[in-house]
Amino acid sequence: MRDGEGLAILKYEGQKADRGLDPDGVEVPIDPRRDETLSIYTEYGLTDRLTLQTKAALTRGHDNFVDYEGRGPIELGLRYALLHTDRSAVSLYLGTTKDGVGRNAGYAAPGQGDTDLEARLLAGTSRQWRGAQGFAELQVARLKRSGLADETRIDVTAGLRPTPRWLLMVQAYTGQADSQPVQSRWRKREISVTRDLGAWSLQAGWRRTLSGRETPVDHGPVVAVWRRF
């Protein structure tokens, strides 16, 4: 993000599950659960290299044992551009999160968790492919979590613009918690399409858990409104 430029994303995520993955990664029935989140994410360029990131959310959900509704996680951090060329970028993000009343980890009970510290390395590149603009990004993160097991996360995104106003994206979210006696793992896939309308963009997609262990097989829509300024 360049000096003085910004981005805001208002996003709704609705996830539900009645199946889960056991310690051996086998899919089994679980008590039905539903989790919904409405979040606002922002980026603002403090300088050409330093970007402020924030995120706040409201959340609600229920299963057979508990209902919850209230504040979701609050995130604050800084991203520094280590390398930036016309086609590629490498950045380092350092941030902190105050966990909310909902599921702060897919394997945990609602409300479990306190404060997280995160270090994340991001690397991305863009290319032309058959007349269309494409890009790919890899993110690797380590989270030190209070009240929850520490986590390692790897996120991969691939995007293609078949026309200047349309963006197709495939994203993979992979993670593992240092939980005991079984380390929870998950791999989720999100496919979405985004339509640009000047400074605004509209995004709609679907997210689903593909594999893992000690984690729910959740799935549901993701809808977002983007605003660049």
In which residue ranges do the predicted regions lie?
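Short helix-loop boundary/capping segments
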Residues: R142-K144, T152-T157
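Transmembrane beta-barrel domains of Gram-negative outer membranes and organellar outer membranes
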Residues: M1-R145, R161-W226
